[in-house]
Regions:
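Helix-start/capping segments and mature chain N-termini
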Residues: 1-80, 87-91, 118-297
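Short, acidic/charged, Gly/Pro-enriched secondary-structure junctions
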Residues: 12, 86-115, 129
Length: 297
């Protein structure tokens, strides 16, 4: 049964023509709405954001909207009207709750495409739905490292590759996850061709050595993580030293703890990386996820 609440944006961009509505309309999520010639479908030419919604609260809404604008800028697309997108997210959550009741965890997905080729009119929509049960993943995951095929400085040398934009073109990321499954793992840490740890297909990497907590720097063509920022707030408040660095992948094996963190799954401690077992501090992992799930902004 389709439980998603769908809102179609009538004014997805600041350049969109004025409308008589709030910039969006609710639609039947079980019916087709996107033109089959839309470049988001035919070329994967667009971007998206996925926002965790806990007890009715969209988490890190403003950072997600800022990242939406950043993706548009990198892709030379019209600037999203974040006032409309914000209202659409909140309206989608409210409508979903009215129909299905208040649920502990939902997600809101925001999608904007370049639209039908030649029209210059972007397409946008938001849908809100229940997600997977990530209880097991929050207790621990097995991970493999895979070569991404790019140097760590690819965003500088080759900006047309759109590293750092949250594009709709996730075929390679999904292929990486299938490769991980073939190797008996749950997820992936991408490594640059010159040996630096980068990110997961849908997550950021957190590395702890003693009182020091690091994440790969975003100047390596990786997404600035909204959940990662909250993880740093958690560790900062507990006296840890946090930093963004270029982290050689061969240093990961010496870490005291590793996590993959993302908006909906939250924080997943790594129990095994490339065959090496890691001891998980279950109390710390639970405390971190409790903190992340308690965010109301």
């Amino acid at each position: 049964m389709n439980t998603a609440t769908l809102l179609l944006l009538t004014r997805p961009a600041t350049s969109s023509a004025p409308t008589d509505d709030n910039g969006f309309v609710e639609a039947d999520a079980s019916s087709p709405h996107v033109n089959v010639m839309d470049l988001g479908i035919t070329r994967g030419d667009g971007f998206f954001e996925t926002i965790s919604v806990v007890a009715g609260h969209p988490q890190a809404l403003e950072p997600h909207l800022a990242r939406l604008k950043h993706s548009a800028e990198l892709m030379d697309m019209p600037e999203p009207d974040t006032d409309v997108w914000r209202l659409a997210v909140l309206a989608g959550i409210e409508a979903h709750q009215l129909e299905h009741g208040v649920q502990r965890e939902l997600f809101a997905k925001l999608i904007m495409t370049r639209g039908v080729e030649g029209t210059g009119t972007p397409t946008g929509w938001v849908y809100v739905d229940t997600g997977e049960d990530f209880t097991a993943a929050r207790e621990g995951i097995r991970v493999v490292s895979l070569d991404r095929g790019y140097r760590h400085d690819v965003a500088e040398t080759s900006p047309w590759l759109l590293q750092g934009a949250k594009t709709l073109s996730y075929a390679a990321n999904r292929a990486a996850l299938r490769e991980a499954a073939r190797r008996g793992a749950d997820d992936v840490i991408f490594v640059s061709s010159d040996g630096y740890a980068l990110e997961g297909p849908t997550s950021n990497v957190i590395v702890r050595n003693g009182n020091r907590v690091r994440t790969p720097a975003t100047d390596q063509g990786i997404l600035a993580g909204t959940t990662q920022a909250s993880v740093f707030e958690f560790f900062d408040a507990r006296g840890f030293e946090t930093s963004y660095e270029h982290i050689p992948a061969n240093e990961l094996a010496a870490a005291d703890a590793l996590w993959l963190v993302s908006s909906v799954r939250q924080a997943s401690p790594i129990t095994n990386l490339d065959g090496k077992d890691f001891q998980v501090d279950a109390d710390l992992a639970a405390e971190l996820n409790t903190y992340l799930l308690s965010r109301t902004h």
